[in-house]
Amino acid sequence: MTELKYSWFPGCSAGSTGIAYTQSAKYVADKIGLEMKEIDDWCCCGTSAARITDDDLMHALPARSLALSERQYPGLDVVAPCTGCYSALKGAQHWARQSEENRKHVSELIDMDYAAKADVKSLLEIMVEPDVVDLTVSRLQKTLGGMKIACYYGCTQVRPAEVCNFDDVENPTSMERLLDACGAECVEWGFKTECCGASNHVVKPKAARKAVERIFRNAKACGAEAIVTSCPLCWLNLDMREQQINSEMGTDYHLPVYYFTELLAMAMGATPDEAGLGYHFEPAAQLAQDRIVADTKTEEVTR
């Protein structure tokens, strides 16, 4: 098994709206021996705002942090937990690798040499490696207890295919494999990669709420009792809007929205607060506590 050591790009949401993701990810990382070295002086990746503003800005912002990582942690690949950050960093890396002209141009923009040799990976991409899945299962104190889960990847976890080269763009299954191995029951549904409308909530709030409602409606119709994601923007948009949608549309959705790392942390022995469940808008602790329980099989595996 390769050494689990990576350069860590936390992203802007890590200490704010995505703090539950950061907290649970670090808990899991500690349990499985995943070492993540934070890039010193990293900057905002620019995400979609830079993408619609200027091509040079879109490439320069993530390339700067990637170049710093190459200087500080030579030979280490970069892990970006936020899928928005992952998309931006992966896109800049892909563009720089297309030609020496591109690489030199972005190096001039950031006034640093960017070699574009280290790979960029999402946290999910690391966690679903077969050896890491086996290691994760070996660290469980409890199972996910057959919790019926709708795995939600969002727009950028697997797209575009030529850049990400990770899982199927229409029907990804990597998160399901990980959570199934930990005792969950992942449902089949068709909204795994549908947009939640997060970027439209300011300019087109009705359209965005409609997108969120469709996701909850379809997850519930497919028998899910929770939605699990790897994207801080999706998590915030879904979790924050659920009660609002119930009030405005007369629906009755009460599906907790979890990060996949929160469930893994709970199964590894974390309390709800340690796993980050106290940061949710829709109450999430009770379902997790009810479903995530020790059983004979888990006790034998972890003994």
Question: Positions of the model-derived regions?
Answer:
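Iron-sulfur cluster-binding electron-transfer modules in prokaryotic oxidoreductases
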Residues: M1-R303
